[in-house]
């Protein structure tokens, strides 16, 4: 006999369609916030979001009379018909699924409403009452996936990756993530280039080119990699349509590969992000729970290919290459005379071997990366401190508090703060490059405070050391070449910020002398033989190209 499903089973099925991980819950609530016009979003995870999940925004808010409908199935203010989907969420299932899966608490107030509303829901029980509330919406979820044995650390990692992805498509959103009360991500809405540094890493982000192109009401913006950066999978190539993160359609991927076909080896893909802004008739969204698949019109795919080709022509990259190499003219050699270095190999995962002319170079990869990061920090400090997304409280020991009036050079250059009661200050501003590292901010503030006569440059040298690639870290050819190219652009490439050498040079004439060859003898001309005890075991040598 066919029977209608009971309400509790419908709720479980709805949860299964929408919520598989904490990341899914955060995605749904984040999209609700973006649809509400939020400019600031705060995410809190307790127990990886399994014990408690909070998403708070400064968006439009939900009127008190609409709060009960917000947690009903297929209830939404966003969708009138299937041809007019202009929001990230549209199915009206997310809050209903959360209500069925956990204890749900929603506090919300539109800006024009006097006072807010509070909704408490669990299963079929729903209670609403008026309460004081700031403008915006705060959603709290308790007991999500209770008893399922989830890994809290894995859930946090998933949420962090999700938020980094959304920042690539909403780079003006001020976004904060806290796990167990500790800040894991603080992004001030500083734009796409800063979002790329966060998502791809600083070294790779430097190898991305800005893209902006439009025609006939279609527009594409983003960042795409130079030819020297590529991957064998398209897993670091991200796409959004009107702010919605979506999977790369196969047709568009073919167009991208065709645009890069003279720049990348066969089977390689670029790295980057494309943000498409399209009228509704230019794409079709697949109406599944993930909302990740789109079908794009031929005109859109052609526009993206045209945009890439125009960019490559402008950057003088549109030419056949035997292998991926950067073709943009390098800056003139430094005063030290360092020429353009060609990567050969990595030795013991710590040193890069490179050649230039008749000289073999051995480069300490950690010291080189330190120098690159240090000079980048020097340039970025000159931009001055920027407001933090949220002020950060820093506890101080009595001796540290006494140093506040000393006016250390590094402290004044990097931070703005105000006293916040005994033994605490509230950080208001910091350099933008420190915003993505909230756990490091108090430490850097105290380091600058305790300066003990050390200069700003000494502090920046220490900061450059922390994230620099370490000895023992394997680097591929593209990564090694990118590191060498970035080193060449430095003003002082020969020494790290601490004064240690970055590279050693061994000229061909030194090799000729040490191997007992005649000057200029290549591949056969032998000098007088060494005594037997000085001879090295013979081994085949690679032919010179």
Swiss-Prot record:
GO biological process, one term: mismatch repair
Pfam families: DNA_mis_repair (PF01119), HATPase_c (PF02518), MutL_C (PF08676)
GO CC field: mismatch repair complex
Record-linked InterPro entries: DNA_mismatch_repair_MutL, DNA_mismatch_S5_2-like, HATPase_C_sf, MutL/Mlh/PMS, MutL/Mlh/Pms-like, MutL_C, MutL_C_dimsub, MutL_C_regsub
Superkingdom of origin organism: Bacteria
SMART domains named in the record: DNA_mis_repair, MutL_C
Annotated keywords: DNA damage, DNA repair
CDD domains recorded: HATPase_MutL-MLH-PMS-like, MutL_Trans
SUPFAM superfamilies, per the entry: ATPase domain of HSP90 chaperone/DNA topoisomerase II/histidine kinase (SSF55874), DNA mismatch repair protein MutL (SSF118116), Ribosomal protein S5 domain 2-like (SSF54211)
Gene3D superfamilies documented for this protein: 3.30.230.10, Histidine kinase-like ATPase, C-terminal domain, MutL, C-terminal domain, dimerisation subdomain, MutL, C-terminal domain, regulatory subdomain
GO terms of molecular function: ATP binding; ATP hydrolysis activity; ATP-dependent DNA damage sensor activity; mismatched DNA binding
Region (Disordered): 517-545
Function of the protein: This protein is involved in the repair of mismatches in DNA. It is required for dam-dependent methyl-directed DNA mismatch repair. May act as a 'molecular matchmaker', a protein that promotes the formation of a stable complex between two or more DNA-binding proteins in an ATP-dependent manner without itself being part of a final effector complex.
Protein family (similarity comment): Belongs to the DNA mismatch repair MutL/HexB family.
Name the record gives this protein: DNA mismatch repair protein MutL
Lineage per the UniProt record: Bacteria, Thermotogati, Deinococcota, Deinococci, Thermales
């Amino acid at each position: 006999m066919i029977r209608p499903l009971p309400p509790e089973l419908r709720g479980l099925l709805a949860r299964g369609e929408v919520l598989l991980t904490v990341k899914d819950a955060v995605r749904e609530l984040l999209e609700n916030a973006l649809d509400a016009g939020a400019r600031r979003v705060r995410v809190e995870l307790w127990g990886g979001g399994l014990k408690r999940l909070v998403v708070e925004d400064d968006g439009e808010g939900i009127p008190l009379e609409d709060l009960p409908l917000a947690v009903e199935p297929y209830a939404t203010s966003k969708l009138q018909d299937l041809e007019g989907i202009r929001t990230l969420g549209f199915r009206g299932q997310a809050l209903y699924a959360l209500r069925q899966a956990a204890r749900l608490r929603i506090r919300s107030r539109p800006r024009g409403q006097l006072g807010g509303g509070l909704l408490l829901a669990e299963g079929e029980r729903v209670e609403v009452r008026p309460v004081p509330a700031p403008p915006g919406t705060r959603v709290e979820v308790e007991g999500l996936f209770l008893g399922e044995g989830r890994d809290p650390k894995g859930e946090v990692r998933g949420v962090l990756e999700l938020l980094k992805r959304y920042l690539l498509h909403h780079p003006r959103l001020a976004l904060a993530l806290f796990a167990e009360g500790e800040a894991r991500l603080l992004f001030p809405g500083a734009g796409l280039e800063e979002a790329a540094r966060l998502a791809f890493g600083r070294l790779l982000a430097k190898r991305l080119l800005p893209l902006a192109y439009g025609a006939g009401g279609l527009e594409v913006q983003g960042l795409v990699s130079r030819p020297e950066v590529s991957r064998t999978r398209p897993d670091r190539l991200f796409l959004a349509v009107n702010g919605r993160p979506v999977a790369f359609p196969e047709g568009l991927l073919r167009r991208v590969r065709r645009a890069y076909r003279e720049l990348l080896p066969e089977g390689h893909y670029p790295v980057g992000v494309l943000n498409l802004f399209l009228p509704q008739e230019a794409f079709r969204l697949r109406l599944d729970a993930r909302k990740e698949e789109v079908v794009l019109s031929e005109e859109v795919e052609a526009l993206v290919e045209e945009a890439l080709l125009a960019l490559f022509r402008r950057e003088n990259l549109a030419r056949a290459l035997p292998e991926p190499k950067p073709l943009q003219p390098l800056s003139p050699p430094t005063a030290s005379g360092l020429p353009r270095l060609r990567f050969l190999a990595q030795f013991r995962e710590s040193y890069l071997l490179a050649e230039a002319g008749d000289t073999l170079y051995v480069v300490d990869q950690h010291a080189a990366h330190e120098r690159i990061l240090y000079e980048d920090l020097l340039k970025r400090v000159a931009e001055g401190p920027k407001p933090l997304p949220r002020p950060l409280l820093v506890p101080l020991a009595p001796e540290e508090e006494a140093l506040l009036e000393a006016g250390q050079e590094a402290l004044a250059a990097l931070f703005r703060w105000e006293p916040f009661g005994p033994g605490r200050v509230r950080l208001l501003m910091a350099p933008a490059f420190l915003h993505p590292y909230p756990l490091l901010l108090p430490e850097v503030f105290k380091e600058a405070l305790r300066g003990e006569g050390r200069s700003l440059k000494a502090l920046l040298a220490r900061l450059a050391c922390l994230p620099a690639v370490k000895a023992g870290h394997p680097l591929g050819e593209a990564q090694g070449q990118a590191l060498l190219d970035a080193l060449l652009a430095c003003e002082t490439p020969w020494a790290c910020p601490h004064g240690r050498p970055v590279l050693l040079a061994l000229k061909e004439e030194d090799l000729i002398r040490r191997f007992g060859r005649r000057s200029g003898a290549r591949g056969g001309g032998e000098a007088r033989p060494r005594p037997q005890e000085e001879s090295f075991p013979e081994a085949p040598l690679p032919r010179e190209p």
